């Protein structure tokens, strides 16, 4: 579509630049506290995961530059390292881990070609995978195992 209709390029560029907000806007609400908000959060999480996968697939098709995906992944990783040190953020950290899993495992074939940035991303995944439950206020077994899954996926490709 973008090759056929020039106006689509501008629309796409605006959309991908505004996506950074949704990829970094993680919130959590307990279903016991506010079930409607909990349901909205679930929809927002699904949208975020879908967008992450969509942009990763666009990178694979060479429509989105890999630098943009690197930036998105690194931003989420940086936020994750901040959130694990905060109290009562384990659900948010779990969701960040899920997004990272989707983007990294689906884009690894291109992502690992930039050895310097890939090394940084991989090192952060390794660091989380080696953490112990409760070593940080908001680290959960789910997050630790999700990062182990990322490493396992990468190892299987080599």
State the predicted function of each range:
Residues 1-158:
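Alpha-helical interaction scaffolds
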């Amino acid at each position: 579509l973008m090759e056929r209709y020039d106006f689509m390029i501008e629309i796409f560029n605006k959309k991908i630049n505004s996506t950074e907000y949704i990829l970094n806007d993680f919130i959590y609400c307990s279903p016991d506290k506010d079930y409607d908000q909990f349901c909205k959060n679930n929809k927002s999480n699904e949208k975020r995961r879908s967008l992450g996968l969509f942009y990763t697939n666009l990178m694979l098709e060479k429509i989105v530059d890999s630098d943009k995906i690197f930036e998105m992944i690194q931003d989420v990783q940086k936020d994750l390292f901040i959130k694990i040190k905060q109290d009562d953020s384990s659900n948010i950290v779990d969701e960040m881990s899920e997004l990272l899993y989707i983007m990294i495992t689906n884009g690894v074939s291109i992502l690992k070609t930039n050895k310097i940035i890939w090394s940084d991303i991989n090192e952060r995944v390794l660091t989380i995978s080696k953490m112990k439950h409760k070593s940080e206020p908001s680290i959960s077994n789910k997050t630790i195992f999700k990062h182990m899954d990322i490493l396992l996926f990468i190892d299987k490709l080599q």
